[in-house]
Regions:
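A short, amphipathic edge element
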Residues: 2-14
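Conserved Nudix-box catalytic region and its N-terminal flanking loop in Nudix hydrolases
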Residues: 5-8, 39-42, 51-54, 58-97
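Acidic, metal-coordinating catalytic segment for phosphate/diphosphate chemistry
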Residues: 11-51
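Short glycine/serine/proline-enriched coil/turn segments at secondary-structure junctions
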Residues: 19, 72-73, 120-122
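Short beta-strand micro-motifs in enzyme catalytic cores
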Residues: 23-27, 62, 126-128, 150
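Short loop segments at secondary-structure junctions
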Residues: 32-33, 54-58, 69, 133-137, ...
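Unchanged
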Residues: 37, 47-49, 83-164
Length: 164
């Protein structure tokens, strides 16, 4: 092990491009050996992902998942409900809101699983993961105007097998 520092000193950050979803910032930073370098970072809101679990008396538990089109990969994606946090919103509040909006389900129990930096090399935000249990179906979704989602119950075992 070494005592050498790896810390860079951020000197300046300038927004160079903005969209409704993220901003791109040009960042000037000074390296540990006193050299200045330019980097680019995506600045976006934190977001949440909720893993809704439907417990079955026979032990065949299921996950509640959503299928939707993802423009980044230009294909359908089967994923857990989630989305961007609103300003001032707590992660747990966002998790419950997103699950209700996308699936029509609420949860009596919700647990924080983890908070991660999805791509800290170029992104400034965090993703908060939650597990939701004791679900109730309100039978009413509240999708964004550009959101087209189908809700699917997928056996936990199937999801585990697909993950390899």
């Amino acid at each position: 092990m070494t005592d050498k520092t790896v810390r860079w000193e951020p000197l300046k950050s300038t927004s160079v491009f903005s969209t409704r979803v993220f901003d791109i910032h040009e960042i000037l930073s000074r390296s540990p050996d006193n050299q200045d370098h330019t980097f680019y970072s995506l600045k976006a809101s934190d977001w949440v992902i909720v893993v809704p679990v439907i417990h079955s008396p026979d032990g065949e538990d299921e996950f509640l998942m959503v299928r939707q089109w993802r423009h980044g990969v230009a294909e359908e994606s089967l994923e857990f409900p989630g989305g961007v946090m609103n300003p001032g919103e707590k992660p747990e509040e966002a998790a419950l809101r997103e699950m209700l909006e996308e699936t029509g389900f609420t949860a009596k129990k919700i647990y924080h699983g983890a908070t991660v930096s999805p791509n800290p090399a170029i992104m400034s935000n965090h993703c908060h993961f939650f597990i939701a249990e004791d679900l109730q179906d309100t039978r009413e979704t509240h999708l964004d105007e550009d959101e087209y989602v189908t809700v699917e119950r997928i056996p936990v075992q199937t999801v585990q097998e697909r993950m390899g």
